[in-house]
Amino acid sequence: MVSEAPKDRLVKVYVSETFKADNEEFLKKMNYEALGKDILEVVSDNVFVRMSDTQTPQGIMAVVKMSEITIEDMFGRDMHINSMNGKNDVNNNTDSNNAASKDDNSKNDNSGNSSNTIQPLLLILENLQDPGNLGTIVRMAEGAGVTGIIMSSNTVDIYNPKTIRSTMGSLYRVPVIYVDDICKAVDECKEKGVKVYAAHLKGTDNYNQKDYAQPTAFMIGNEGNGLSDRLTQKADELVRIPMQGKVESLNAAIACTILTYEAVRQRL
């Protein structure tokens, strides 16, 4: 993940003495020294272990400055976006060698001309508490071309180390923002012509019966309690994911993926 960090946002890169000795070609290729003489710092293995939050650190970590964005920035974005996130700095203590394949996501506009601009596809998350869930959602969001993720202020910290690792580098490229008033944020989306759907047990229609080719937002609630009544009332429509057996609900990340990729399918 460190190798994927936008170089213009790198504040500091720390490597252990062992990592430096074993990865000279990698460090030469990354050329961190060109960013400034103080960017790269080599520390002893013992110091690096104390700096890390994992028992077997890989020997490289970074401090990356993230740009702040507004909800306005999430409408009609280019598919090949740079990461712009709603908080400042983050310690990134993860693998430098992760890589992911990317598809050509170019779309055609209504005139038939080639365009990279897509209709807004947003995720609105309320009070998610599991770092792994949030990280999985961010990673999925990049693959699906989600234009932004809006989170309530009581959602787990996106910069939780477990969350960062779960994103597998997607955190650099998916715009995310925390808001103090999630209902107000939904109102802003609706004012921009975004239709808001809530995944809800009281949904009367199956999720695949709606039109998501238009500007769309999906609301996903807390793992145990779902969406609050206050936020549910802001939805234009409630949809449900049909299930069999005694299962009443799905994992938040799974539900989010099902809904989002239905929108992707419709937009192909």
Descriptions of predicted regions:
Residues 198-246, 251:
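Active-site/ligand-binding-proximal alpha/beta "capping" segment
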Residues 43-44, 126, 152-153, 175, ...:
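Short beta->alpha connector loops at strand-helix junctions that form conserved
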Residues 30-32, 58-60, 165-169, 213-217:
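Short, hinge-like loop/turn segments at secondary-structure boundaries
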Residues 18-20, 46-47, 154-156, 223-225, ...:
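Short, acidic/turn-prone active-site loops that include or flank metal/cofactor-
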Residues 140-144, 158, 163-171, 229-268:
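Structured adenosyl-cofactor binding patch, chiefly the S-adenosyl-L-methionine
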Residues 1-55, 87-90, 94-103, 107:
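N-terminal positively charged helical leader segments and presequences
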Residues 53-55, 59-60, 64-80, 116-117, ...:
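Acidic/glycine-rich phosphate/pyrophosphate-binding loops and surrounding catalytic core
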Residues 2-15, 32-35, 76-87, 116-203:
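RNA substrate-binding interface of SAM-dependent RNA methyltransferases
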